[in-house]
Amino acid sequence: MVLLAGTANRRELAVERAAKKEAVESLNGLFQTTSVAIVAHYSGLTVAQMQKLRQQMKQAGASVKVSKNRLAKIALEGTDVAAIGPLLKGPTVIATSSDPVAAPKVAVEFAKANEKFVILGGSMGTTVLNVDGVKALASLPSLDELRAKLVGLVQAPATKIAQVTTAPAAKLARVVQAYASKSEAA
């Protein structure tokens, strides 16, 4: 009987190890592809508040992960955002996004509305960010907004060039029209 109980425990441990290994691989894949990672304490938030945070992150193109800190630290090894490892103490949540502004912007806005959500810091690539760094990053325009501004800047000179090249022809047409009107009047 004791042997059977021991065998069941070994199977459970093997399944648990496999699940942990899968979680580490999944997190590592996420950390490999992200450009920014934000760490925050979420102790005291309700399930509804966490769902709202996840929804806001998803709408912004970011994601939120809650995992065991030990597993997250293992998954961080060899990634650009590995510097956030020391921040993983206590009940932490990790927000990530490929847009360097999306996750920080949502996290800062959520922290303003929920005092129990406390931003600890983060990482943008290999650059470590403190709380002020995360807030500064959140104040920047998003990648899409920057692209729109860049397109506007590129299009503006083209529009001006078109106006300059058509202006002499328009002036010439007005001179000819005035001369024709003057000839008809005389």
Swiss-Prot record:
Keyword terms, alphabetized: Ribonucleoprotein, Ribosomal protein, RNA-binding, rRNA-binding
The family this protein is said to belong to: Belongs to the universal ribosomal protein uL10 family.
GO cellular component, as recorded: large ribosomal subunit
Coiled coil: none
CDD domains reported for this sequence: Ribosomal_L10
Segments traversing the membrane: none
Any Gene Ontology biological process: translation
InterPro entries linked: Ribosomal_uL10, Ribosomal_uL10-like_sf, Ribosomal_uL10_bac, Ribosomal_uL10_bac_type, Ribosomal_uL10_CS_bac
Pfam families cross-referenced by the UniProt entry: Ribosomal_L10
PANTHER family linked: 39S RIBOSOMAL PROTEIN L10, MITOCHONDRIAL
PROSITE patterns per record: RIBOSOMAL_L10 (PS01109)
GO MF terms, alphabetically ordered: large ribosomal subunit rRNA binding; structural constituent of ribosome
Native species: Rhodopseudomonas palustris (strain ATCC BAA-98 / CGA009)
Function: Forms part of the ribosomal stalk, playing a central role in the interaction of the ribosome with GTP-bound translation factors.
HAMAP family named among the record's database cross-references: Ribosomal_uL10 (MF_00362)
Protein name, per record: Large ribosomal subunit protein uL10
Keyword Ribosomal protein assigned: yes
Description of how the protein assembles with itself and partners: Part of the ribosomal stalk of the 50S ribosomal subunit. The N-terminus interacts with L11 and the large rRNA to form the base of the stalk. The C-terminus forms an elongated spine to which L12 dimers bind in a sequential fashion forming a multimeric L10(L12)X complex.
Gene behind this protein: rplJ
